[in-house]
From Swiss-Prot:
This is Ephrin-A1. PROSITE patterns: EPHRIN_RBD_1, EPHRIN_RBD_2. Residues 196-216 form a propeptide. Residues 29-161 form the Ephrin RBD domain. It comes from Xenopus laevis. A lipid is attached at residue 195 (GPI-anchor amidated serine). Glycans are attached at residue 36. The lineage of its organism: Eukaryota, Metazoa, Chordata, Craniata, Vertebrata. Residues 162-181 are annotated as: Disordered. Belongs to the ephrin family. GO terms for cellular component: plasma membrane; side of membrane.
Length: 216
């Protein structure tokens, strides 16, 4: 009886780990970056986020409540996906490298958000395909004024056994975010939920346990 019980426990644990890994690979984690000058991480010279294939990068644009600030003071940005050389100089070569435009700081539905999925294959002809072990580079240019201020981000796609590069931002929470602990004035926080399907492992555990108990 004890041997059967131990086997049942091992089976449940093994299946649970397998289901968790499958959900992790299928759903991916979300990494949130607040793209505004108040984000202190952009003050680092090598601000880097580590992701894995099937993860998501959520870019949250600057947002202000209507009437909270003067229109000429709000931040607007054009974001580019560029090569390393352009990342270093912060000068994109072509308008074809434009990835997104954060140009609706007073959007009625809340802050604009853009999503990048780091997938190996894409069904779109002009889509970007990402590879493990490589680093991808994002930079922005301000729309709200003509200046040389540059905000830039490195995203490293690591494999299962690939060690992260130096100075990589890897928070412990499942929802990876650079949201500051102290609320910023005039900036609305974004709300994100767990990307994994809720309750699936627990439900499977229960069914397996019930079936095994019926056999005892």
């Amino acid at each position: 009886m004890m041997e059967l019980y131990r086997a049942a426990v091992q089976l449940i644990v093994g299946v649970g780990l397998g289901v968790g890994l499958w959900l992790r690979e299928a759903q991916g984690e979300r990494h949130i970056v607040f793209w505004n000058s108040s984000n202190y991480r952009f003050m680092q010279e090598d601000y880097t986020v580590q992701v894995q294939l099937n993860d998501y990068l959520d870019i949250v644009c600057p947002y202000y409540e209507e009437g909270s600030v003067a229109g000429h003071t709000v931040e607007r940005y054009t974001l580019f996906l560029v090569d390393y050389e352009e990342y270093e100089t912060c000068k994109p070569k072509s308008k074809d490298q434009v990835r997104w435009e954060c140009n609706k700081p007073f959007a009625p539905h809340g802050p604009e958000k853009f999503c990048e999925k780091f997938q190996k294959f894409t069904p779109f002809t002009l889509g970007t395909e990402f590879r493990e072990g490589r680093t991808y580079y994002y930079i922005s240019k301000p729309i709200h004024y003509h200046g040389e201020t540059c905000m830039r981000l490195r995203v490293h796609v690591s494999g299962r056994t690939t060690p992260p590069p130096v100075n990589v931002h890897t928070p412990r929470s499942h929802i990876q975010s650079d949201e500051p602990e102290v609320p910023l004035p005039g900036v609305m926080k974004s709300v994100a939920g767990n990307s994994a399907a809720p309750g699936t492992p627990c439900t499977l555990y229960g069914l397996l346990l019930a079936a095994l108990l019926l056999r005892l």
